[in-house]
Regions:
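A short, structure-level motif marking secondary-structure boundaries and short turns
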Residues: 1, 36-37, 59-60, 122, ...
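Mixed-charge interfacial surface used for oligomerization/domain docking
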Residues: 3-5, 11-30, 97, 101-106, ...
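Positions that flank functional sites
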Residues: 34, 93, 202
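A short glycine/small-residue-enriched secondary-structure motif
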Residues: 45-52, 75, 80, 107
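Glycine-rich phosphate- or other oxyanion-binding loops that anchor nucleotides, phosphorylated ligands
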Residues: 56-92, 99-103, 147, 151
Length: 296
């Protein structure tokens, strides 16, 4: 096995068990509700249903990124003992955490000139798409690849990962400035579920306005067929995540599993975590898979 440490952040929205099994240490973001600060701890201290119920009832969570000091504290034990670290961050298109991570990595390099080095990669991803990229990275690492080889694989393939999502509740997107008040009012009145993606710069980008949830479910499956490697013969991994809308995500998963029978296992469904969920609110369904390279 390669002799370096692969690390990430809690915004990757995979389970605690996944990170433990794949030997990927995780540093956590934070969120705040009613002046109380909580840790985005992979739902160890709150359930997804309770968290999204708070938002549905009017709670307005605020989020904060991992600080430079927290990164230093997280990596220092590895660096001090001479272990190199490869760290993937949440997309720089939606968070400033990449910059903080780079600052912390340089500070540790200055403090431990003979110690391990930290290499930081901007994933350009979020939620379980970020988590899927980590899974592929762990596979490459476990094949015996060096840190540089693993980093090169990530950089070469990260834009082949697709991230598509829709939401039936636009209130959190309005509050976060991702859509205008007029769009939110019209969208709610017309039952529009916007189909969105993460673009090649790692930013949220609207792609299509779809009337009704039923059509959005169907269009999400069609979108995968338009971009996935090999079409119906795709044999790679597909992951989905959702924010308190299990029935909707299972409906999309059922369509995809019917249309792509060669999938690597059944579609894994995860809960959107508290960090990302603070911005989506309830009602978001997200889909992640390997496809053609994103160019816009």
């Amino acid at each position: 096995m390669s002799d370096f440490v692969l690390t990430c952040e809690s915004a990757a929205d995979r389970t605690r068990e996944f990170f433990a099994a794949r030997n990927i240490p995780v540093v956590c973001f934070h969120y705040e509700i009613d002046d109380v600060v909580y840790t985005d701890d992979l739902y160890q201290s709150i359930t997804p249903d309770k968290f999204f119920a708070q938002i549905a009832a009017g709670a307005m969570p605020k989020t904060s990124q991992v600080s430079v000091g927290e990164y230093e504290e997280f990596w220092e034990p590895f660096v001090a003992e001479g272990k190199d670290v490869l760290h993937l961050t949440l997309s720089s298109g939606i968070s400033g955490t990449y910059g903080s991570a780079c600052v912390a990595a340089q500070m540790l390099a200055d403090r431990y000139p003979q110690g391990g080095k930290v290499r930081v990669i901007d994933s350009l991803w979020a939620s379980s798409g970020f988590g899927l990229l980590l899974e592929y990275a762990a596979d490459v690492r476990d094949s015996g690849a060096s840190l540089d080889e693993t980093a090169a694989w990530i950089e070469e393939h990260k834009l082949n990962l697709h991230h598509w999502f829709f939401s039936t509740d636009l209130s959190s997107y309005l509050r976060g400035g991702r859509i205008s008040a007029a769009s939110a009012i019209i969208g709610t009145a017309l039952k529009i579920c916007p189909l969105m993606t993460v673009d090649c710069d790692g930013k949220l980008a609207p792609r299509e306005k779809i009337r009704t949830k039923k059509r959005a479910i169907s269009e999400m499956a069609k979108t995968m067929m338009a971009h996935v490697q090999g079409g119906t013969d795709y044999s790679g991994k597909c992951i989905m995540s959702h924010s308190a809308c299990r029935e909707d995500v299972e409906a999309v998963a059922a369509l995809i599993e019917e249309q792509v029978p060669q999938l690597k296992g059944k579609i894994e469904i995860n809960d959107i975590g508290t960090l990302i969920g603070s911005h989506t609110g309830p009602g978001t369904v997200a889909l992640f898979f390997m496809g053609d390279k994103r160019v816009d």
